[in-house]
Amino acid sequence: MERGLHLGAAAASEDDLFLHKSLGASTAKRLEAAFRSTPPGMDLSLAPPPRERPASSSSSPLGCFEPADPEGAGLLLPPPGGGGGAGGGGGGGGGGGVSVPGLLVGSAGVGGDPNLSSLPAGAALCLKYGESAGRGSVAESSGGEQSPDDDSDGRCELVLRAGGADPRASPGAGGGGTKVVEGCSNAHLHGGAGLPPGGSTGSGGGGSGGGGGGGSSSKKSKEQKALRLNINARERRRMHDLNDALDELRAVIPYAHSPSVRKLSKIATLLLAKNYILMQAQALEEMRRLVAYLNQGQAISAASLPSSAAAAAAAAALHPALGAYEQAAGYPFSAGLPPAASCPEKCALFNSVSSSLCKQCTEKP
């Protein structure tokens, strides 16, 4: 019974293996037929063996297909056989092929997605590599710089460009065939991601626009710098003129000018100059008063008859002690003068001090 079970298990395993091989062969044939069935207006060629990648770029997680001709009209397709497909429908059977993760071409579309059924048959898609970053890539991606606004999800975009006519047009129409240009938008690839020609042109236009904006901003910054330099030069000249004027003011102010004395500050110089000006004004006022008093005394002495001698005698008569002091002090006038005038005349002579003199005159009999 155990032998029967083993035989049954062996038969079942052989049936499964035969079924797996037949399914793999049919799937490979269907893929080969689908890839080799050339649609109108498209020329497809088989992919050459994949190039050896350098060790530095062997860990690239994404592979893209390169055009077969310089114009990019054809597509490089992987060999029909694969070492084991991923994504629920990959082709298997041959050990020499390279697997494309997640690629499934069937009646429902590419990769089992009905939304992609509108793509022409045999169009190459760069699918998300998923988590298998260590697997070998199918082909090198086209050269070019990576656009700064690419998505970082590692997907590749398929750009279909029509050459001015319907893709289903006759192959004889010049330039009427559909050109499929691939663009890989993988943020992990720093220099190997391909860009469509339009993308490169757009980025070039944006760069030129940015260059124009940078030129205008640099011009504005230069103008602002020149204006700031002019303002600084004007302020520097103004401060130099102010310092020179203050030095001249310190030179005329009477204070101790010596190396041991600290130089006056600007505020101290101005305060000292103000006080000096006020002092000079007060001295001038005192001088004016003195000059006015002297002029008034000269007019009084010229108008009096006995002149100053009579005034001295009158003062001696009124104040004997003062007269004796003046004589002892060597008063230049002699005492032997004519008698003094009457009291009203004295009051008229000394009108400035008539308050006490006239009072004495009025009190006399």
From Swiss-Prot:
GO terms for biological process: axon development; positive regulation of transcription by RNA polymerase II; sensory organ development. This is Class E basic helix-loop-helix protein 22. The keyword Repressor applies. Kidney, lung, brain and pancreas (insulinoma). It comes from Mesocricetus auratus. Residues 82-93, 191-216 have a biased composition (Gly residues). CDD domains: bHLH_TS_bHLHe22_bHLHb5. The gene is BHLHE22. Residues 226-280 form the bHLH domain. GO terms for molecular function: DNA-binding transcription factor activity, RNA polymerase II-specific; E-box binding; protein dimerization activity. Keywords: Nucleus, Repressor, Transcription, Transcription regulation. Heterodimer with other bHLH proteins, like TCF3/E47.
